[in-house]
């Protein structure tokens, strides 16, 4: 199996492609956008979840995806997370002036979820909450954890997701992705009080 990742960096937006024997993905991302998105993935529920990251994170996303969904959606979701995470890490550059940390507690009907992130360059992922099982159309619910883990790994991000309580599986998913968008928005934002300094006593972030 061949893997290729092509990245084009500029301060405003990033275009990236990933092509393997299982998937082909084209992505354009602007971390400092207005929450505009356009998806063509053939996986409707996945698009629905990604739209929440975009809208609530004010991250512009343009995603085209073709994968081996005749088998299942695993490769498509996993490879999208790899590409998105890599793109986030690359676009942040040296991370000068950003807040670095972000957290948000979000309610959706009976569900309460907290998401916390640290963009300091050290990977960790922890999910606490109800087991994610079942299907939404062709999308297996447990793929959301695969997406979050691979996103955090490739963005070199510390990501904690805590679903305090809630029963409706759709609401649980929405609360996670919306809160993630909100937390990323906080972490990526420029902190005017730091005058563009690196947000670490080490003076450098990977």
UniProtKB/Swiss-Prot annotation:
Pathway: Amino-acid biosynthesis; L-histidine biosynthesis; L-histidine from 5-phospho-alpha-D-ribose 1-diphosphate: step 6/9
KW Cytoplasm (keyword) present: yes
Subcellular localization: Cytoplasm
Protein name: Imidazoleglycerol-phosphate dehydratase
Any one of the GO BP annotations: L-histidine biosynthetic process
Catalysis: reaction(s): D-erythro-1-(imidazol-4-yl)glycerol 3-phosphate = 3-(imidazol-4-yl)-2-oxopropyl phosphate + H2O
Enzyme nomenclature, EC number: 4.2.1.19
Keywords: Amino-acid biosynthesis, Cytoplasm, Histidine biosynthesis, Lyase
Family: Belongs to the imidazoleglycerol-phosphate dehydratase family.
NCBIfam families in the cross-refs: PRK00951.2-4
A Pfam family reported for this protein in Swiss-Prot or TrEMBL: IGPD
GO cellular component terms, A-Z: cytoplasm
